[in-house]
């Protein structure tokens, strides 16, 4: 055994977490820092996210995939926008659909994944894992959207502009779209057609003038990327939001300096949602010296913990 070589490798002993009563989330996370596996990765994510949010020169991108809003994560994201911790939001259409549903006072309901889905269909109840919502909610949403589309300017619009107008028509301080519209934070949804918002836009366009340029957002988005001095990304899940954010740096002279990915997908199948941030370095999307980590766990568990711990640290600056 080469003891000198081993000493260079065996530098950081695992330190067991000590749990005491009345701990804050940040104190718990600091105990995680001495642990391995997911606990250690979560602690690293908090360290990186704190540094990213504390940096005034860093443009903060947030990728929102999956079904985070029906699961109850919208308040966290709206508050991050309101407090200046998200500069650019890229999302799936579904997240904004369910954000709008809630903003209209139409609730999602806790249900069960062990149920009779045929019975739910007969009762006109839709299921998202263990979340239920009535079909009637979509009828009400569609009526609202048709009214918004009827009031849009008769000029060519980007998808971002359409989402901003939807946000301006909402009256709910917990709404992501409303908060983003008020704070001037752009919300990009490259696959808006893949949602009820997009479907209703198409239905409206069948009988009325509606001019939406699906590529118009690219110019605005790339300008943000070119002008930023430093860039950081918090990625919930993968899919279109993750790729749209990371690919943007391919046409700029820089890469992301910070990157955090919260996912349950794995890299073996070659899909983007499971692709590691190390893999993104091979493309030049994430910088050679970037601070990055992937946390393999349910984002509805990890996001609140990370944000809570980081907010505690930010409040003590």
UniProtKB/Swiss-Prot annotation:
Q: In which pathway does it act?
A: Protein modification; eIF5A hypusination
Give one Pfam family, short name only. Answer: DS
Q: Name one GO cellular component term.
A: cytoplasm
Query: Which Cys pairs does UniProt list as disulfide-bonded?
Result: none
The EC number(s) given in the record are 2.5.1.46
EC class of this enzyme?
A: transferase
Q: Which domain of life is it from?
A: Archaea
Q: Which cofactor does it need?
A: NAD(+)
Query: Which keywords are on file for this protein?
Result: Hypusine biosynthesis, NAD, Transferase
Q: Which reactions does this protein catalyse? A: [eIF5A protein]-L-lysine + spermidine = [eIF5A protein]-deoxyhypusine + propane-1,3-diamine
- State the PANTHER family in the record: DEOXYHYPUSINE SYNTHASE, DEOXYHYPUSINE SYNTHASE-LIKE PROTEIN
Q: Which family does it belong to?
A: Belongs to the deoxyhypusine synthase family.
Describe the function of this protein: Catalyzes the NAD-dependent oxidative cleavage of spermidine and the subsequent transfer of the butylamine moiety of spermidine to the epsilon-amino group of a specific lysine residue of the eIF-5A precursor protein to form the intermediate deoxyhypusine residue.
Q: What is this protein called?
A: Probable deoxyhypusine synthase
Q: Which gene encodes it?
A: dys
